[in-house]
Curated annotation (Swiss-Prot):
Residues binding FMN: 67-72, 82-83, 88-89, 111, 146-147, 191, 201
Effect upon mutating H199A: Reduces affinity for substrate 230-fold, but has no effect on catalytic activity
Organism in which the protein naturally occurs: Escherichia coli (strain K12)
Name listed for the protein in its UniProt record: Pyridoxine/pyridoxamine 5'-phosphate oxidase
One annotated GO biological process: 'de novo' pyridoxal 5'-phosphate biosynthetic process
Cofactors: FMN
Length: 218
C-alpha cells in the first residue's frame, strides 16, 4: 500500500454521532453542575482514565505544547493537577499562566474545554495530596528530573531502588521540586456530538459573579 493509498483510507475514517443532543433548556446555571454530571457518567461508563485531561501551555516563543495529566480535584475555584515543578509545563506556566484543559470523552461523544489561569498550590495543599499517594508513587516523584534527557530507563529504575532503600523507614518527604496548579474557571465549553456533524456546543463565560451561556455553531 502506498503512502497516498493509506492517506486516502484515513481520510475516509468517520462515523455518525448518535449518543444524544444537548439543549439550552437542559443546561444548569452553573457549569460545574454539568461537568460533575458528565464526569460521573464517564466514570459509570467505565471509560479508561475518565479524569485524564490535556493541558495546553505555550513557551516564551509562542510555541504550544500539550500533555495529558489527571484531574485530582475541582470546585468553584478551579481544576487541580500535580506535577514536577522542574517540568516543561511548570516552567511554561510560570512564564505564561494562561492555559487550556480538554477532557476527551470520545466514547460518550463528548468533550469539555476549560480556559483559565494556572496558579501554584500552597505547600499545605500539596503535602496533603502527596502523602495520600501510594508509597511507591511518592518515591517515584523523587526519581525523575522531568523533561530532562536520559540515556536509558535503567537509570530511573536504579535510582528508584536506591531511594526505596533510603526511605524504607518512616514517611517519604515531600520533594521541594514537586507541586500542583489550580486552573481558574474563566470559560468552559461543552461539546456533544450530533448527527450530520451538527454538534451541540455551549460556552459558559464568567461575567462578574454570574455565568453567561451561549450556543456556538459547530
Amino acid at each position: 500500500m502506498s503512502d497516498n493509498d493509506e492517506l486516502q483510507q484515513i481520510a475516509h475514517l468517520r462515523r455518525e454521532y448518535t449518543k444524544g443532543g444537548l439543549r439550552r433548556r437542559d443546561l444548569p446555571a452553573d457549569p460545574l453542575t454539568l461537568f460533575e454530571r458528565w464526569l460521573s457518567q464517564a466514570c459509570e461508563a467505565k471509560l479508561a482514565d475518565p479524569t485524564a485531561m490535556v493541558v495546553a501551555t505555550v513557551d516564551e516563543h509562542g510555541q504550544p505544547y500539550q500533555r495529558i495529566v489527571l484531574l485530582k480535584h475541582y470546585d468553584e475555584k478551579g481544576m487541580v493537577f500535580y506535577t514536577n515543578l522542574g517540568s516543561r509545563k511548570a516552567h511554561q506556566i510560570e512564564n505564561n499562566p494562561r492555559v487550556s484543559l480538554l477532557f476527551p470523552w470520545h466514547t460518550l461523544e463528548r468533550q469539555v474545554m476549560v480556559i483559565g489561569k494556572a496558579e501554584r498550590l500552597s505547600t499545605l495543599e500539596v503535602m496533603k495530596y502527596f502523602h495520600s499517594r501510594p508509597r511507591d508513587s511518592q518515591i517515584g516523584a523523587w526519581v525523575s528530573k522531568q523533561s530532562s534527557r536520559i540515556s536509558a530507563r535503567g537509570i530511573l529504575e536504579s535510582k528508584f531502588l536506591e531511594l526505596k532503600q533510603k526511605f524504607q523507614q518512616g514517611e517519604v518527604p515531600l520533594p521541594s521540586f514537586w507541586g500542583g496548579f489550580r486552573v481558574s474557571l474563566e470559560q468552559i465549553e461543552f461539546w456533544q456530538g450530533g448527527e450530520h456533524r451538527l454538534h451541540d456546543r455551549f460556552l459558559y463565560q464568567r461575567e462578574n459573579d454570574a455565568w453567561k451561556i451561549d450556543r456556538l455553531a459547530p
